[in-house]
Amino acid sequence: MNWKFWQRRDDTIGPDPTEAHPLGEGFSSGDTAGGDSSASGLFKGMITVAAIYLLAALALGIWWSQEPDRFDIETAARELGQSGDTNVTGYLTTATTITVAKTLLEKPGGYLTNDLFAPGIWLDNMPSWEMGALTMLRDTARVYRNDFSRSQSQSAENPNLAEAEGKFFFDNNSWFLPDTEGEYKAGIVYFQNYLGQLSDQSANDAQFYARSDNLQAWLAAMDTRLGSLSQRLSASVGKRQLDTSLAGDANASQSTATPAEQMVQTPWLEIDNVFYEARGFTWALLHVLEAVENDFGEVLDKKAARVSVRQIIRELEPTQETLWSPMVLNGDGFGLVSNHSLIMASHISRANAAIIDLRALLAQG
């Protein structure tokens, strides 16, 4: 009952406490509805942002997974911009090695192996490719330090090359303190310093010796790597393999016993990793082989071996053909599905055999 004569009904706030009302009548639900609407809008906004992020990461991942194209070694050598003589022995091979290292860091997405965030952390094919190219770079840097830059075993090593080798052998998966990219960039700088010394005709503190034994040392390193890659690629389908570790030497021994026969097979989840590692290694090797043909031209011509180097290049070129399949296929033997690993192993095995023949030819006096 509204017994206060000065208070009109429309001035009251809420229900009359003296009158009975159904439970809940007179209370507004506007605040509750507004809260639910705000929470729903926030949730939808978060979903939208997450979807946009995932789509952008997917697009970047596809772009970053594109392998670098082959480059022209002479153009790359000119672009390095050394002020000295660019026609000196070893200049083209050194400039090519530097360009391979720079491409490893400057390709789309940069260096991905040590990434901690999307999309880099989701990718595994490109880090495997980087590992292959890095392996070739490390082997070449070691041969530079021990062979290419030294006249004989008792000669002093070049300090720039000694530092460069250590930088390139730094952990390939370090994100911080120090980061891998920083160490590899330092290695490139040391190689550029060596290149500058080579092109300076007024200085003789750095040399590149284009000799047959030096070339054999580098080919031996490449031979070993190609042989390993060929075996790992061939094991994609699994095969029974005899132990030939001590074959050819009746007096040889080994530290621990191994089975006379064992099944060798690459784990299923590692098949594409081995495939892309092989592509990265052969990509880098192709460029350095082209430079070696130029810098060791006189040595090769004396043995009529220039055509052998060109044949090795010809055997390796198919390893860089476009992979049209969205994934690395692993068909079994002569089955209906292609086996990309076996095709890659075939090309690498032929190139490896040609390198072995070239080494034998160079060793013949």
Language model features: what each stretch is:
Residues Y184-I313, Q320:
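Extended amphipathic alpha-helical interaction segments
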Residues M46-L60:
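Hydrophobic membrane-insertion alpha-helices, especially the h-region
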Residues N2, E74-E79, N273-Y276, T282-G365:
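A cross-kingdom marker for long, charged
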Residues A59-I73:
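Hydrophobic single-pass membrane-insertion segments
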Residues S29-A39:
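Cytosolic juxtamembrane amphipathic/interface segments immediately preceding
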Residues M1-G30:
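N-terminal intrinsically disordered, acidic low-complexity segments at the extreme N-terminus
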Residues E74-E183:
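N-terminal Sec/ER secretory leader and immediately downstream segment
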Residues D115-N125, D171-P178, Q262-D272, S325-I343:
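A cross-kingdom feature marking solvent-exposed beta-strand/loop segments within repeated
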